[in-house]
Design a protein with these regions (language model features):
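Cytosolic juxtamembrane amphipathic/interface segments immediately preceding
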Residues: 8-27, 85, 89, 163-170
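N-terminal signal-anchor transmembrane alpha helix
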Residues: 22-53
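Interfacial/capping segments of alpha-helical transmembrane domains
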Residues: 43-65, 106
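Interfacial helix-start motif at the membrane-water boundary
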Residues: 66-93
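Conserved mixed alpha/beta catalytic, RNA-binding, or beta-rich assembly cores of soluble enzyme
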Residues: 104-121
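Interfacial helix-loop-helix junctions of multi-pass membrane proteins
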Residues: 119-135, 188-199
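A structural-propensity feature for long, helix-poor, extended segments
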Residues: 132-155
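Terminal transmembrane helical module of multi-pass membrane proteins
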Residues: 147-199
Length: 199
């Protein structure tokens, strides 16, 4: 007799698989965190060419123009779409030698450092506390995505490449759906609300 599908048991099992895979991938995630924070320090302390600074500022100006006039639900959806796409690409494009998640960690860390430096110069050191709520859920989700993206690329190093890739891919997909996306939903709600209220 065919066993009846139980949604709750399925979800519980997926969470167990997801957290077990994250735990087994912690060194890759820690590496991503390390890359991110090293380049955030670079962005904060080292002067950068004016052309790069202008590009970063223009990027944020473009984001502001895109979100101007959005309602709170629209703002939340906009942020969630951006972050979920970034997380997806960082994870699954990592299959190509881990290049995309590494470069994304470098770029995101550098931009955070630059923005933090600009904020401190304009509003003082305590202005950094305003940035904290924006990243409390988003950054862990992105670190997990990028870390698993780097791990996904290591299938090329083992003997049974295709089987290993399938295993990594399926586990990564489970983590993306059951861990990363929920974190990004919470992050979008918090960040969207803060932006909407002008915090």
């Amino acid at each position: 007799m065919k066993k009846k599908f139980n949604l709750r048991n399925f979800i519980d099992e997926q969470y167990k698989i997801s957290f077990s895979y994250i735990k087994g991938s912690k060194n890759f995630i820690y590496s991503t965190i390390g890359i991110f924070f090293v380049f955030s320090l670079v962005g904060f302390f080292l002067p950068i060419p004016e052309s790069i600074a202008t590009q970063i500022i223009n990027y944020f100006k473009e984001l502001v123009s895109k979100t101007a006039g959005l309602s709170l639900p629209e703002m939340i959806l906009f942020l969630f779409n951006n972050n979920s796409i970034s997380g997806f690409m960082g994870l699954f494009f990592g299959a190509v030698f881990g290049i995309f998640p590494v470069l994304s960690s470098i770029a995101n860390g550098f931009v955070l450092g630059f923005v933090s430096n600009t904020s401190v110069h304009q509003d003082g050191i305590f202005s950094l506390w305003r940035l904290f709520p924006h990243g409390i859920f988003e950054l862990p989700a992105i670190f997990i995505s990028f870390g698993l993206g780097i791990k996904l690329s290591t299938f090329i190093l083992v003997k049974d490449k295709w089987k290993t890739f399938q295993k990594f891919f399926i586990n990564s997909l489970s983590v993306y759906i059951f861990v990363i996306l929920p974190l990004l939903v919470i992050a979008a709600i918090i960040e969207g609300t803060l932006i909407y209220l002008g915090a």
